[in-house]
C-alpha cells in the first residue's frame, strides 16, 4: 500500500513514493483521452474502492497488480467528473455520487478513523463536497441537498472527534489554502440559502463546525512542519 507517507521501497530513508500522485497521474492520463470507463476503473482497482454498478468500467493494465494507492481529493473529483460525463449533470446522478463518497470515506476517511483511530486517515475535504453541492445547484436537485449535507455533517463531526482524540496526528493538507477553500464552500452554502433550500441557521451551524475542523488541520500541519525533517520526493526524471 502506497500512501502519502514514508515508504521503504526506496534505498534512501528520507525519500518516499507518493501513492496519491501516482494514482492521479494514471487517472489524469485516462481522463485526457476522454476514457471515463478507464478513469473509473483505475480509481476502483488501485484504491480498492468500489464504484456504483450503474457506471461503465473496463479492464485496465493494472488489473493484475496487488498495489493499493491512497487516493487524494483531486483523484476523487476526477472520478466524479467521469461519472458526470457518463450520466450527465442530472438530479438522479447525485445519489450515485453520494454513494461513491460514502464508500471512499469507509475505506480511507473519517469512517475508517472512527473504527481504526490509530490509522492515519485521508479525509474528504471541503473542495470535494463543494463540487457535489455545486452540481446540486446546476441540476436543480433540491431533494438531494439534505442527504448531501447530512453526510457532510457526519464527515465534519467524525473528523473533529479524531482531531481531539489521543490518536490525532497532523493530517495531509491537500488544499494550498484551507481558509480560501472554506470561504468558497461557505459561498456555495449561501447560494443554497438564497434558493431557500436550507435555512440561515443550518448554514451557520455547518460553517462553525467546518471552521473548527479547518483550524485543527492548519494547526496540526504547522506543528508538523516545525518538527518533521525534510523528505525528498522522487523527481519526475525518476532519479533521487
Residue ranges and their predicted role:
Residues 1-240:
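A basic, Ser/Thr-enriched alpha-helical scaffold prevalent
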Amino acid at each position: 500500500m502506497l500512501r502519502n507517507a514514508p515508504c521503504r521501497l526506496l534505498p534512501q530513508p528520507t525519500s518516499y513514493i507518493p501513492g496519491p500522485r501516482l494514482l492521479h497521474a494514471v487517472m489524469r492520463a485516462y481522463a485526457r483521452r476522454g476514457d471515463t470507463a478507464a478513469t473509473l476503473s483505475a480509481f476502483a482497482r488501485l484504491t480498492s474502492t468500489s464504484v456504483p454498478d450503474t457506471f461503465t468500467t473496463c479492464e485496465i493494465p493494472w488489473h493484475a497488480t496487488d498495489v493499493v494507492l491512497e487516493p487524494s481529493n483531486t483523484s476523487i473529483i476526477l472520478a466524479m467528473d467521469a461519472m458526470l460525463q457518463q450520466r450527465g449533470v442530472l438530479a438522479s446522478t447525485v445519489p450515485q455520487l453520494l454513494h461513491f463518497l460514502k464508500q471512499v470515506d469507509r475505506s480511507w476517511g473519517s469512517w475508517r478513523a472512527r473504527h481504526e483511530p490509530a490509522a492515519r486517515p485521508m479525509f474528504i475535504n471541503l473542495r470535494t463536497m463543494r463540487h457535489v453541492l455545486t452540481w446540486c445547484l446546476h441540476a436543480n436537485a433540491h431533494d438531494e441537498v439534505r442527504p448531501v449535507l447530512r453526510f457532510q455533517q457526519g464527515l465534519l463531526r467524525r473528523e473533529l472527534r479524531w482531531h481531539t482524540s489521543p490518536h490525532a496526528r497532523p493530517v495531509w493538507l491537500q488544499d494550498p489554502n484551507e481558509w480560501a477553500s472554506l470561504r468558497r464552500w461557505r459561498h456555495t452554502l449561501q447560494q443554497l440559502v438564497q434558493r431557500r433550500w436550507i435555512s440561515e441557521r443550518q448554514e451557520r451551524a455547518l460553517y462553525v463546525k467546518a471552521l473548527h475542523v479547518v483550524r485543527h488541520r492548519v494547526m496540526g500541519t504547522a506543528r508538523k512542519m516545525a518538527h518533521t525533517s525534510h523528505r525528498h520526493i522522487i523527481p519526475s526524471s525518476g532519479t533521487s
